[in-house]
């Protein structure tokens, strides 16, 4: 073993398999001895990176949990595939590490989920530990950890061939120890990484921008319609902040008593049923598009949409029936605590939602941002989650989503709020589409670059144009 990094590897004891299972791009169980471009070589991964696994400290000892050591579980990987992570859902501590087979691994360790949900890849952004559901590599000087990350990402489909098991697919250690990677010189690895990272960095920036835009819209909704800041300011003789005189004039300058406590004078206690219709547009056999672009419950989380699944209407899932239009709010009625909700700021022919969503369609276009931001407030999602019943599939009735309570302002206030909030939500949609386009380009270039079939000069101009 040529690579001798600091520390001794701890992995399961069985030796590497002597069989060969070729991957799709640049990874294989065993040496496939297939031809490679000049300057590229099939190398056993453990010659250049220390193989590690992880462990779960005992749940019977609560003192092992909570602390300063991030602990990567499957949910961290599925939520952050391909990314460098700094935070995890669960944390352990040095007591948990000392009393288990878990160990703290250094920043830039590359982690691959090997069981349950096979094939998810993350990189440690700081020293962390993982569960036993991962195999981890601490890379030496001859392999760039980011290059290894991209190799593993490119082989997502191949991992199912490397795995075995009926109930749960698992990649076992004899196969992992036999991993061979097609490697060029490290300076070539870094140039490839720089090209792919330029796309990923732009995608991450768009996601961060969208999170900021969404936060601004939520904060504005809370200020106007929950905390009543403009009304409070006027009642105290101050000018409302962050708005011009014409907008400020739309708000009353005093409060009145209601069943909800003090609310702005002239506003009223109501529900979203006053502003939005429920599940009003559905496809039927007589009125249906030839093809549908389908969004299911797994296809959106906290207004981040996956690309729609495309079917002919005849072949689409039976739940693919809700016609979606600009301004619609989607809120999952099944397991609402999973936060499968979103706002339709742009549409396309045949855009279709699952019948597992409550679809709130605004009665006026200017009501749309208010409906979305009210229905998807953390407090309301928590309310729906608490009301969900049923064993395997806890759910709420769609009417409970439409019945979300609100304090209803005068319509000119809703019009003004729309003028501020809708451009933010529309920009989120535009940015998300741009990010999806960049991801498609990355996924097209990835296998060709990582295998040496595409030379860098052939794609660098295309990448620069895409991220400009």
Indicate residue ranges for each PLM-predicted region:
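Non-catalytic DNA-recognition/assembly elements of restriction-modification systems
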Residues: 2-4, 8-11, 15-55, 178, ...
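Sequence-specific dsDNA recognition surfaces
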Residues: 19, 23-34, 43-62, 70, ...
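Hydrophobic residues in beta-strands and at strand termini
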Residues: 36, 74, 124, 139, ...
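A short beta-sheet element
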Residues: 73-75, 89-153, 321-322, 326-380, ...
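Hydrophobic pocket-lining residues within nucleotide cofactor-binding pockets
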Residues: 77, 176, 300, 401, ...
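Glycine-anchored helix-breaking recognition loops at helix->coil/strand junctions
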Residues: 115-118, 126-135, 150-197, 297, ...
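Amphipathic alpha-helical hairpins/coiled-coils and adjacent low-complexity
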Residues: 233-237
């Amino acid at each position: 073993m040529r690579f001798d990094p600091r520390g001794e590897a701890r992995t399961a004891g069985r030796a590497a398999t002597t069989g060969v299972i070729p991957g799709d791009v640049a990874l294989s169980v065993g040496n496939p001895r297939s031809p490679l471009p000049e300057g590229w070589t099939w190398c056993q991964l453990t010659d250049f990176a220390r193989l590690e696994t992880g462990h779960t400290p005992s749940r019977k000892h609560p003192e092992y949990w909570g602390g300063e050591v991030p602990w990567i579980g499957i949910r961290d990987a599925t939520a952050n595939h391909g990314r460098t992570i700094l935070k995890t859902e669960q944390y352990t501590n040095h007591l948990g590490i000392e009393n288990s087979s878990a160990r703290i691994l250094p920043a830039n360790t590359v982690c691959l989920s090997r069981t349950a949900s096979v094939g998810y890849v993350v990189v440690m952004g700081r020293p962390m530990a993982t569960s036993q559901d991962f195999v981890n590599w601490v890379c030496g000087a001859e392999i760039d950890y980011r290059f290894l990350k991209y190799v593993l990402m490119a082989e997502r489909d191949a991992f199912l061939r490397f795995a075995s098991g009926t109930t749960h697919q698992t990649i076992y250690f004899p196969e992992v120890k036999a991993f061979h990677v097609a490697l060029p010189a490290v300076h070539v690895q870094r140039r490839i990484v720089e090209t792919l990272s330029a796309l990923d960095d732009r995608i991450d920036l768009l996601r961060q921008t969208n999170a900021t835009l969404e936060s601004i819209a939520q904060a504005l909704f809370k200020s106007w319609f929950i905390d009543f800041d403009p009304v409070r300011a006027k009642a105290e003789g101050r000018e409302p902040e962050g708005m011009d005189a014409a907008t400020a004039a739309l708000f009353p300058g005093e409060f009145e008593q209601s069943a909800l406590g003090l609310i702005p004078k002239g506003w009223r206690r109501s529900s979203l049923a006053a502003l939005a219709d429920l599940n009003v547009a559905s496809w039927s056999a007589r009125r249906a598009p030839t093809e549908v672009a389908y969004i299911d419950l797994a296809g959106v989380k906290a207004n981040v949409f996956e690309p729609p699944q495309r079917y002919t209407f005849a072949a689409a899932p039976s739940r693919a029936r809700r016609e979606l239009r600009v301004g619609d709010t989607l809120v999952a009625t099944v397991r609402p605590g999973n936060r499968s909700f979103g706002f339709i700021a742009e549409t396309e022919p045949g855009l279709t939602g699952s019948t597992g969503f409550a679809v709130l369609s605004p009665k006026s276009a200017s009501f749309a941002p208010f409906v979305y931001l009210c229905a998807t407030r953390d407090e309301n999602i928590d309310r729906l989650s608490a009301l969900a019943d049923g064993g395997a599939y806890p759910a709420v009735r769609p009417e409970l989503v439409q019945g979300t309570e609100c304090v209803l302002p005068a319509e000119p206030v809703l019009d003004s709020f729309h003028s501020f909030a809708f451009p933010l939500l529309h920009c989120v949609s535009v940015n998300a589409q741009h990010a999806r386009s960049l991801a498609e380009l990355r996924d097209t270039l990835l296998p060709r670059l990582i295998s040496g079939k595409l030379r860098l000069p052939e794609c660098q101009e295309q990448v620069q144009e895409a991220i400009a």
